[in-house]
Regions:
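Expand to "…catalyze enediolate/carbanion chemistry for C-C bond making/breaking, isomerization
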Residues: 2-559
Length: 559
């Protein structure tokens, strides 16, 4: 099963279609990518095909279950903890002890897997680098495959390079590098450039499978003293403990297939859906031999609330997104429950993102933003988190100082059980308690950020600087879903008295595109994908039926 894609737009690997069903037929339909043959080896492709054959039916069942669960929430208008798993929540159990490389996670940096980011993230001084194939990556075939090549090159010490402008990028000594934790795509996304038996593989199977196949043994051979001494993962968009169970079974299968000791893999689950927030114990329990912790998201969590309660009435209408902070009562309840759950079970609790991009041109903006970042990280450290995320290397020392002040020489604060007061379902769902208002300014910001992000995503960029913030797909999701929610609930905007309507959104969108055309100039504007982005933005914001993920209708536009 050779994988040189340069000879044909579609290569068939493996057995002919008439062969035994025991032999998978694999088709690589992606465009040529330099050095793809180093990643898409016959053995690696067969490994991914094995994951597909073993687990694709269950993935599809779980995706169907998401729709059933959403219908149940719509009918009930609420959520609660699962009665059938009360014994797990009440039980006395812990997850496996974290390996040495994951004991101290006080600062984690996130970003895509392009060559420049690989070097900068590993050198950043952060303890962990979340190498992102998910929300910070636009999943072009080039990005997906080159990202895998770049990670292998980093481990092999051949990632150094010099730009055309003469700037050199080189890794520090291995002991000074961040530990890599890879985030594959969520269960819902297909990879249309690799088919098994005529069916696209899950992006999750491809991202996880290629990385694990090529690097698991390599990392273990480096020894426990090395920061990169094991295969570690972040699991996104998990909606239930059954989805965590599937990941655990994938891990068990993968380790057995490659002769890697059981329990070598460690995974941190992002609690970025409202349904997962009600199943934190259960999620850790399903992954207990492979679990490393839980992470508290923000934009995707709010997006999930809108998605699930979009027709549940005024109580669930989110105000301007920038007014909803992690200190809002319902968000504070969610983070409190996450810290309590993690520390009770011996897992790390990792805080949210500081997305600010420092500017050398505007010291006043920098000073105000860095003060806000410091306050956020001080709060997280004081609330019991064991670490937190940043999006830019310049924020690493800011976050580290906040956690150093609380942790000192301790690697974490898992021995702190957190507040003893239980968190209730009512507290998690008290959206109205956030206060705030819905405004035209907030609506305009949602349009501005949404259209800018989608256009960049269509050009292959997944992490995009917008208004001094590093944004990824989660920001676009909350932006477009809030627009949908406000329109369908007849929200009246507090600052102007206008009603949120599709017509108003189209007016704001047209004005924004005109401003962008004037700002960029005709040539640069014409070279972009603004018209396609505008059509897609209208589709996912204004359609009668709510689109589960904007990336689903966007994916075919990537080519």
């Amino acid at each position: 099963m050779a994988a040189d894609q340069g000879t044909s737009p579609s290569l068939r690997l493996g057995a002919p279609a008439s062969a035994s069903p025991a032999v998978p037929v694999v088709t690589v339909a992606g465009p040529h990518v330099d050095r793809a043959e180093e990643v898409l080896t016959p053995e690696a492709v067969a490994f991914v095909a094995g994951l597909h054959r073993a687990f694709e039916d269950r993935r599809q069942e779980l995706l169907a279950r998401r729709k059933t669960r959403r219908a149940e929430i719509a009918a009930a208008g609420t959520l609660d903890f699962l009665p059938g798993t009360a014994d797990i929540r009440a039980g006395d159990w812990k997850v496996a002890e974290a390996p040495r490389a994951l004991q101290d996670r006080r600062v984690e940096i996130t970003g895509p897997t392009d060559r420049k980011m690989v070097v900068n993230a590993l050198n950043s001084g952060a303890r962990i680098w979340l190498a992102d194939f998910e929300d910070a990556t636009s999943p072009t075939w080039e990005n997906v495959i080159s990202g895998q090549v770049n990670l292998i090159d980093a481990y092999e010490g051949r990632i150094d390079f010099t730009t055309a402008a003469g700037k050199a990028y080189a890794l520090k000594p291995a002991a000074e590098l961040a530990t890599v934790v890879v985030r594959p795509r969520g269960w819902h996304l297909d990879e249309n450039h690799l088919l098994v038996d005529g069916v696209p593989v899950a992006g999750a199977f491809l991202d996880f499978g290629l990385y694990f196949f090529h690097n698991a043994a390599r990392l273990l051979a480096r020894g426990a003293e090395d920061p990169n001494s094991g295969p570690y993962f972040y699991l996104p968009k998990t909606e239930s403990h059954l989805e965590a169970r599937l990941w655990n079974d994938v891990f068990t299968h993968a380790q057995a297939e490659l002769g890697i000791p059981y329990g070598t893999i460690r995974a941190t689950v992002l609690i970025e859906t409202i349904t997962a927030a009600f199943e934190m114990d259960e999620i850790l329990y399903e992954l207990r031999d492979h679990a490393a912790g839980l992470n508290a998201g923000r934009w995707d969590y709010l997006f999930s609330i809108v998605k699930n309660f979009r027709d549940a009435g005024a109580h669930y209408i989110l105000p301007d997104r920038n007014s909803v902070t992690m200190a809002s009562p319902f968000m504070a309840a969610y983070t409190r429950l996450l810290v309590q759950t993690c520390h009770k079970r011996g897992a790390h609790a990792i805080g949210g993102m500081a997305a600010f991009i420092p500017s050398r041109k505007d010291p006043e903006v920098n000073a105000a933003a860095l003060e806000k970042v410091k306050a956020d990280k001080d709060r997280e450290a004081g609330n019991g988190f064991d670490g937190s995320w940043v999006a830019h290397p310049d924020l690493v020392p800011v976050a580290r100082a906040s956690f150093d002040a609380v942790l000192g020489e301790r690697p974490n604060q898992k021995d702190d059980p957190g507040p003893s007061e239980p968190v209730t379902a009512a507290q998690l769902l008290d959206i109205a308690g956030a206060g705030g208002t819905c405004t035209r300014a907030g609506l305009r910001n949602a349009v501005q950020v949404g259209i800018r992000y989608i256009e960049a995503w269509l050009r292959g960029l997944g992490a995009v600087g917008i208004f001094h913030m590093m944004e990824d797909a989660a920001t676009a999701e909350i932006s477009r879903s809030q627009i949908w929610q406000w329109i369908h609930n007849g929200v009246v905007l507090a600052d102007t008295g206008e009603k949120a309507t599709a017509e108003l959104v189209r007016t704001l969108l047209a004005a924004e595109l005109a401003e962008l055309r004037a700002e960029l100039g005709e040539e640069a504007y014409g070279a972009g994908r603004w018209s396609e982005a505008a059509r897609l933005f209208e589709q996912v914001s204004l359609a009668e039926e709510f689109e589960d993920f904007l990336t689903l209708p966007a994916l075919p536009l990537l080519g």
